[in-house]
Amino acid sequence: MLRLTLASLGVAMNNLAATYSDLGRHQDALVMGEKTLEFQRRVLPENHPDIGISCFNLGISCHIVGDLHRALQFAREALRIFQATLPPSHPHVTQAQQLVLRYEGDTARRS
């Protein structure tokens, strides 16, 4: 039961990071997203899909603030986790694949 409570706390933290982003507080979203990921890595199994969601969201936050290298790293990690834990047709897998392709293109154009 405690693990479920801790997992729920991670989801709430991730939701707070998303809310910051929705409000245009992108630096706050990035900080909260990093805290969320750190927390989830302590309390969840290594390839838990919630960790993938946090990586996905952090990728978006990094991209918004202009850190394309980290954005691509987080997007790739999200994709790796989703491919390891979800069926290939799951929307998270598709969204992460699209994000990786987009960020690879952005990174190549910036080089």
Describe these PLM feature segments.
Residues 1-111:
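Intrinsic-disorder-linked linear interaction elements in eukaryotic regulatory proteins
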